[in-house]
Amino acid sequence: MMLEGKSYLVSRSLPSSCEPETEWAYLAHEVLSGKRPTPEDVEVEDLDEADGGGKRSKPPSPQPHTPDICEGHGSSRHASGCGEQQGTGSNPMNSIGRDLTINCLLRLSRSDYGSVASLSRDFRAMVRSGEIYRLRRQSGVAEHWVYFSCNVLEWDAYDPYRERWIQVPKMPPDECFMCSDKESLAVGTQLLVFAMAHIVFRYSILTNSWTMADPMNSPRCLFGSTSVGEKAFVAGGTDSGGNILSSAEMYDSETHTWTPLPSMNRARKMCSGVFMDGKFYVIGGVANNNRVLTCGEEYDLKRRSWRIIENMSEGLNGVTGAPPLIAVVNNELYAADYSEKDLKKYDKKNNRWITLGKLPERSVSMNGWGLAFRACGDRLIVIGGPRTYTGGTIELNSWIPDERPPVWNLIARRPSGNFVYNCAVMGC
């Protein structure tokens, strides 16, 4: 759905059944590398240039934007407003069959789906309805993009696969979102942002737009959350009266509905959530009388029951500060200890945290606030920047966990506010 510069059919390996289909590859290449409008005044920041070295390892790439899939592309645009190539031979489904075409589409980068939608009405319907993403999910195909906000009402997105920045439309100017105290989560093809007065806005990559979303059954803030596939889970937090909650809910991004879940054993706010080994975990937080909780809770989706894990967050950070900064990669739990600037890994067998090494040097925080720590596919991502009095820079560092101490790679940098208010990773 999101356009960029020159693209090709295969962004990652395809089954051998797709290789002989040169006609489909040619047609897709013609559309994806065709004549499309791109902002000429905005460029992706090159790392060498950002470092001040005065050298470029590659020419600047145009920054993609996130148009509605009905945006036209060059001369193929119809008067109706939706681009579609004309001619009986222009629809690959007629040439190689629907099943094989869809199999190829599933493995195409989702940043190309805006162009794919211009091939035919069938393709456009698959993208606009979200069917293509449901099929990707069923086939185990996903790309993870990072969405984060360093300014009120503004969001940036970054595609680490193609090293591209993507423009996200500005949020509607609702007064409830004018302060920085918001929470967010990504689920399916949606980004949910929660603000004061229990107002929720939903950004959809299918339409590239923001809309008002239904609130939870028990609206809350300062809760723990996570998502897997088209489902999201929230637990704990506080209600509008400041009462600390033990209740939990599940959100279905396909139906846009919230369903109550059994309550946790202990009420908590300022907790964190992850999905690991097929279960929902809520870690840390604060109970009544500002008592810090070191226990975690595990929710079994099949049994619909919670289990307390004592001392699960013992040794993470101090008694004050942000909720635990945790992330799961390949069913292994990691934490950013912002008090010591350490990266830690959870030892499931012994219920303890092991220090692996340090966090990126230039990623600073205010007791954990302003720093983002997320899983992005098979890698960990730290988003933050150095504190400066003039201007600001946001940096994205990544590391793919292995058996060695972490070696962080700077994958992106751009001028921006360097305090991250919200961050979510969308995998679809």
Task: Locate the predicted segments by residue.
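Eukaryote-biased RCC1-like beta-propeller repeat architecture
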Residues: 162-166, 170, 208-209, 256, ...
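Beta-propeller blade signature
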Residues: 155-160, 200-207, 246-255, 294-303, ...
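Conserved short beta-strand element of beta-propeller blades
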Residues: 94-95, 116, 134-150, 174-194, ...
